[in-house]
Design a protein with these regions (language model features):
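Glycine-rich phosphate-binding P-loop
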Residues: 1-19
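Hydrophobic alpha-helical segments, principally membrane-spanning helices and signal/leader peptides
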Residues: 12-14, 36-37, 83
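Conserved NTP phosphate-binding and transfer environment spanning the P-loop NTPase/kinase superfamily
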Residues: 65-134
Length: 134
């Protein structure tokens, strides 16, 4: 996935929490995206900023096909409960998930979106609740 947003939106924080859940690092900053494949810029490969600790080098994947764009927005920015159906990132044309990056459930929301995109879960069409008659 590609995580983007303004400074202070929680990109590195969310990345750290996703790494703790078993996700792999491609890049913490300056991602190069070519034909849907993301890779780190040469001088930053394997580096991640751990605020309050410093720059850490760790194992990383050299490249991966991106399947989801995660747009982190400031905490005071409202996010619709039910976003536009089939929302796409205008920069990448990837499916788009908007999040508050520092929200406690952000990693779970990313995992659920990835599960839906990879067939491990089913995203129901909006307005379609099982058991509803109308």
């Amino acid at each position: 996935m590609l995580i983007f947003g303004p400074p202070g939106a929680g990109k590195s924080d969310l990345l750290l929490r996703l790494l703790g859940r078993g996700h792999d690092l491609v890049a913490d900053d300056r991602v190069e995206l070519t034909d849907g494949v993301a890779c780190a810029s040469e001088p930053l490969r394997g580096l991640i900023e751990v605020r309050g600790w410093g720059i850490v080098q760790r194992a990383y994947l050299p490249a991966v096909r991106a399947v989801l764009a995660v747009h982190l927005v400031p905490a005071d920015t409202p996010i619709s409960r039910m976003p536009e159906e089939n929302a796409r990132c205008p920069l990448t044309d990837l499916p788009l998930l908007r999040l508050h990056g520092l929200h406690v459930s952000a990693p779970e929301r990313v995992d659920i979106a990835l599960d839906c995109l990879t067939g491990r879960a089913l995203l129901l069409p909006q307005g379609c609740m099982p058991g509803d008659d109308g």
